[in-house]
């Protein structure tokens, strides 16, 4: 049976963290560790996490292991790197505070995509629904994952949501987030993981199901302009300046035609 490390990084997340903790705890798949990395929050985030862990210890039927640390960091992706270092599962998934699994058997569905005794795929990936801060469905994510994903596909945008991207932990730990890419460090990371999977001859496998409810209004949306600049830098790094400019020109033309 494959194992999962679910990494949740928090900072001042008292309004969102409880939903995510409960969603992970409700997963019926047993082979899960939840790695919680807090950036020394000053609100009630750490209190809520510590209460959750204490409650788990009183429940002998609790299915999952929880790993937790709170300390200052250099931002979200530095915290994610700390989480990667602590991950011990076969696959790692980043689930931000406020994000949830759509079903209690979501991880069972993901695990079921890997055959018994099969060489583990490099990446497992699925679809995404966008929800509001009450968990109400808003829309299906506009970008739809392709059937046969390649790192080259990301030149057209982040076709798989970061929170729907299950990377083999050994690949992920060899490709830590590069902080110089700012709010688009997740795009760069996904591309590099897929490149490494290709180099090792590992498949990228679709799940054909919604695997995450993504909380609307993430950091890249709140800081849209700086995120776009960082993303252009990522695209240029992986696909070259000419291809990146051509793709962005097409984005502009398409946007104009839709008006």
What label would you give each PLM region?
Residues 1-26:
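N-proximal low-complexity "stem/linker" segments adjacent to membrane-targeting elements
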Residues 2-5, 33, 188:
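Cell-envelope/extracellular polymer assembly enzymes that use nucleotide-activated donors
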Residues 30, 38-48, 96:
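A conserved acidic beta->alpha catalytic loop
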Residues 70-87:
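Glycine-rich, basic loop-to-helix element that forms the pyrophosphate-binding segment
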Residues 92:
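Short aromatic/hydrophobic "clamp" motif used to bind/position activated sugar donors
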Residues 96-100, 127:
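The conserved acidic donor/metal-binding loop of glycosyltransferases
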Residues 104-138:
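Conserved donor NDP-sugar-binding/catalytic core segment of glycosyltransferases
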Residues 126, 140-227:
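Conserved nucleotide-sugar donor-binding catalytic segment
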């Amino acid at each position: 049976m494959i194992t999962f490390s679910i990494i949740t990084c928090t900072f001042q997340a008292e309004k969102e963290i409880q939903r995510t903790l409960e969603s992970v705890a409700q997963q019926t798949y047993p082979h899960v560790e939840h790695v919680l990395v807090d950036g020394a929050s000053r609100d009630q985030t750490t209190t809520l996490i510590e209460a959750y862990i204490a409650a788990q210890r009183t429940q002998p039927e609790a299915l999952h292991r929880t790993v937790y640390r709170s300390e200052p960091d250099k931002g979200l992706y530095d915290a994610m790197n700390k989480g990667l270092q602590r991950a011990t599962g076969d696959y790692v998934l980043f689930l931000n505070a406020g994000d949830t699994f759509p079903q209690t058997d979501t991880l069972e569905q993901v695990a079921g995509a890997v055959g018994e005794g099969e060489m583990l795929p490099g990446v497992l990936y699925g679809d995404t629904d966008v929800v509001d801060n009450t968990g109400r469905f808003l829309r299906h994510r506009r970008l739809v994952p392709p059937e046969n994903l390649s790192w080259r596909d990301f030149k057209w945008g982040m076709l798989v949501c970061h929170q729907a991207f299950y990377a083999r932990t050994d690949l992920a730990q060899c490709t830590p987030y590069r902080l110089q890419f700012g709010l688009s460090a997740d795009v760069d990371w996904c591309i590099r993981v897929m490149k490494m999977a290709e180099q090792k001859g590992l498949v990228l496998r679709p799940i054909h199901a919604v695997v995450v409810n993504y909380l609307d209004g993430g950091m890249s949306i709140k800081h849209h302009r700086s995120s776009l600049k960082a993303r252009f830098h990522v695209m240029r790094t992986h696909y070259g300046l000419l291809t990146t400019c051509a793709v962005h020109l097409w984005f502009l033309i398409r946007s104009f035609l839709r008006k």
